[in-house]
């Protein structure tokens, strides 16, 4: 299954978490979608890129390690994780149309975010 399709499956899970003001562990997310936790960063990249390009709080900030309570090293959409989580909790996600598989693929292609720094991303966006 393509990563963009998996990302499209993850989106509603994350919006539900945001509405309920909850985080989701990598382990639980992996079990919910049938993917090993080690492969989730690759699947969260299109969501992170889409949120950055659309000026939305980064939904991927809600996926955290069980022990650390923090997103993995691939999360670079914001330097202040607690503030970004608070922004994601406050956002009106039920009013946002979920992105399509094609929109997620386009976002990841236009702004590949995994493995880049926040400074590099801002530079790519001209910010």
Question: Where are each of the predicted segments found?
Answer:
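Nucleic acid-binding interface residues in structured DNA/RNA-binding domains
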Residues: 1-9, 15-18, 22-127
